[in-house]
Design a protein with these regions (language model features):
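Generic hydrophobic transmembrane alpha-helix motif, especially the helices
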Residues: 112, 143-148, 153-217, 251
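Transmembrane alpha-helix boundary and packing residues in multipass membrane permease domains
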Residues: 74, 153, 182-186, 195, ...
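Glycine-rich helix-loop "coupling/hinge" segments at transmembrane-helix boundaries
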Residues: 185-189, 214-215, 263-308
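Gly/Trp-centered helix-boundary motif
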Residues: 2-149, 153, 160, 174, ...
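Residue-level hotspots within the lipid-embedded alpha helices of multi-pass solute transporters
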Residues: 137, 141-142, 200-203, 213-214, ...
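Amphipathic cytosolic juxtamembrane alpha-helices at the membrane-cytosol interface
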Residues: 120-135, 160-162, 166, 220, ...
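Hydrophobic core positions of alpha-helical segments in small-molecule transporters
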Residues: 66-70, 136-140, 168, 181, ...
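Transmembrane alpha-helices
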Residues: 131-147, 235-267, 316
Length: 333
């Protein structure tokens, strides 16, 4: 007697048979890996590096890279220029064959950028002045950054110090920094140390307030609260959790404070309270060139230091912005 099957039963059996064949074929594609106890003990680690990623992102900015190379070339040349052959002393007065000073001589093969009003070589004084101004700018920027970051972190993170630091800030911030700069430069003996001290007295205030505001934003985030609950020390939280997040903005502020300090040196020297006239600096060179600005044949004495000052200012600004963008953790994957 023939057994009749429902068409749906036949379809189901066919489907199950095909599924079984597929499962068997899939099993043939795979095999168990042998167990290696030594490899099992090894742990994987990411090859990601924050600074490598930052430098890679920064190197993509061609303009910033060009300006960085230009600035490094200027800085290096300012230090090696006195050691090159055939260079004049920046402080020496050059006399002619008749024994008289070579005053305001036009650029020539002997004096590449000419001489100033007392016969000093402008090429030598330009690079010596650039070296002095860069030293002042870098030193002031580092002092302002060190003091400002320390005070700003404590101000923003330690709640008990908030009232005290706020009062200190209100007192110092209400005194115009220009007046302090002028008074200190007038009272103390003119010199590089005096300029640096005068600009550092109040220069850290802006950095401290900026860091304090940034710390307040990230102070009570979950990972910082968790660190405090686990008993992590305040110093470790500041160093490991807070400051790395602020690297980009700190670098930008430092990069901008360097031309700012150089500009302050130029200003204070321009009004006659800065470095002595015998000490070459961009401020002194611009002040000397200003007096000759109305003489068409001598305007070059103002143009040279102004061009160097412009290059330094623009370069630090562009480099600081580019590095800030590259170092921003938000831009890292």
């Amino acid at each position: 007697m023939a057994i009749l099957k429902h068409p749906k039963v036949d379809a189901l059996e066919t489907s199950l048979s095909e599924q079984l064949k597929r499962d068997l074929s899939d099993q043939e594609l795979f095999s168990f890996a042998p167990f290696d106890e030594e490899e099992a003990e090894q742990t994987g680690a990411s090859n990601y590096s924050y600074w490598r990623s930052t430098l890679h992102a920064f190197s993509k900015n061609k303009v910033a890279m060009f300006l960085l190379v230009l600035m490094l070339s200027i800085v290096i040349f300012t230090f090696i220029q006195p050691m090159l052959p055939g260079q004049y002393d920046a402080f020496a007065v050059n006399n002619g064959a008749n024994g008289l000073p070579l005053k305001n001589k036009q650029p020539s093969a002997e004096h590449w950028l000419g001489t100033n009003s007392i016969g000093q070589d402008l090429w030598a004084r330009l690079w010596s002045g650039t070296r002095t101004s860069l030293f002042i700018g870098l030193t002031c920027a580092l002092i302002e950054a060190a003091v400002g970051i320390l005070m700003g972190v404590l101000w923003g993170y330690v709640r008990k110090l908030d009232v005290l630091f706020t009062e200190i800030y209100n007192v110092l911030d209400n005194i115009p920094s220009t007046i302090i700069l002028i008074l200190v430069s007038f009272i103390l003996k003119p010199g590089v140390g005096t300029i640096i001290f005068a600009m550092s007295i109040t220069g850290w205030i802006g950095m401290a307030r900026f860091i304090r505001n940034q710390i307040l934003i990230i102070r009570d985030r979950d990972y910082n609260i968790a660190s405090r609950c686990l008993g992590t020390s305040t110093w470790r939280i500041i160093v490991k959790n807070l400051l790395p997040y602020l690297v980009s903005v700190i670098m930008l502020r430092v990069a901008l404070s360097i031309p700012g300090a150089i500009g302050s040196e130029v200003f204070i020297t321009y009004i006659g309270l800065g470095l002595p006239a015998t000490v070459p600096s961009l401020g002194n060179l611009i002040n000397e060139g200003r007096k000759l600005m109305m003489s068409p044949n001598l305007r070059y004495q103002l143009i040279y230091p102004t061009v160097i000052l412009s290059i330094v200012t623009i370069s630090f600004y562009m480099i600081g912005n580019a590095f800030s963008d590259a170092a921003d953790p938000k831009n890292h994957i």
